């Protein structure tokens, strides 16, 4: 899980790989994988799971990739000693990963410093959708639509977009317009979403 409220001990045990208290669970995973058709490559969805890299690599002899996409937000939710220990454990296991995939140039630069990952070991694959083969659809309405698709949190700036939308509506007068927002929202961001709704109520 990437829930920052989970106990620090659980995070550390996940990062300690098969040398921690979760060794039995790691062994079960490895035994199961050995009995299945082997993949061409294994991708860990975030660096908080890097403790699996070594055991999986040894069991499958397949390349290990690890996606980097904002783990520092969850690490910052840990209490000081746990955060420092978690970062140290991730750094210790960077060598077990063949390739890191960052979702932006900023992420690549930030994670290079945070986890001491050699920059040459990181490939940048921006988030997005390939539009080849698709055509623009006609609008189903004349409304001017502003869209937001990202995690709902202050650092993503939905409140800034809401303020801008309020100004836009005032400049547009009675012309039809709407703001459509979608994305993951953690339980700890409910009050933030209510603040954004309050801003939009002025539109």
Model-identified regions with their sequence ranges:
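Carbohydrate-associated surface elements
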Residues: 106, 128
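Membrane-proximal helix-turn-helix segments that form the acceptor-binding/catalytic region
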Residues: 30-34, 58, 81-100
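Conserved donor-binding/catalytic core segment of Leloir-type glycosyltransferases
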Residues: 138-156, 162-166, 179-180
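Nucleotide-activated donor-binding/catalytic signature segment of Leloir-type glycosyltransferases, i.e.
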Residues: 180-183, 193-203
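A short, basic/aromatic alpha-helical/loop segment that forms part
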Residues: 131, 153-158, 174, 187-190
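Active-site proximal beta-strand in glycosyltransferases
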Residues: 41-43, 56-74, 123
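A short, histidine- and acid-enriched strand-loop-helix "catalytic/donor-clamping" loop
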Residues: 17-18, 47-51, 67-82, 96
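Conserved nucleotide-sugar donor-binding subdomain of glycosyltransferases
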Residues: 1-41
């Amino acid at each position: 899980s990437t829930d920052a409220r989970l106990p620090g001990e659980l995070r550390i045990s996940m990062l300690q790989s098969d040398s921690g208290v979760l060794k039995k669970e790691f062994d079960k995973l490895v035994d199961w994988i050995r009995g299945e058709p082997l993949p061409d490559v294994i991708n860990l969805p975030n660096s908080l799971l890097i403790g699996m890299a070594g055991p999986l690599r040894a069991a499958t002899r397949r390349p290990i990739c690890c996606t980097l996409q904002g783990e520092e937000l969850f690490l910052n939710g840990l209490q000081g000693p746990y955060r420092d220990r978690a970062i140290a454990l991730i750094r210790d296991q960077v060598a077990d990963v063949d390739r890191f995939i960052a979702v932006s140039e900023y992420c690549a630069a930030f994670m290079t410093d945070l986890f001491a990952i050699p920059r040459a070991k990181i490939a940048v694959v921006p988030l997005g959708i390939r539009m080849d083969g698709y055509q623009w659809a006609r609008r189903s309405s004349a409304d001017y639509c502003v869209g937001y698709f990202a995690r709902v949190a202050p650092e993503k700036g939905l409140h800034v977009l809401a303020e801008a939308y309020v100004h836009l509506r005032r400049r547009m007068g009675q012309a039809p317009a709407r703001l459509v927002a979608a994305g993951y929202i953690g339980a700890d961001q409910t009050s933030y979403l209510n603040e954004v709704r309050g801003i939009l109520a002025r539109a």
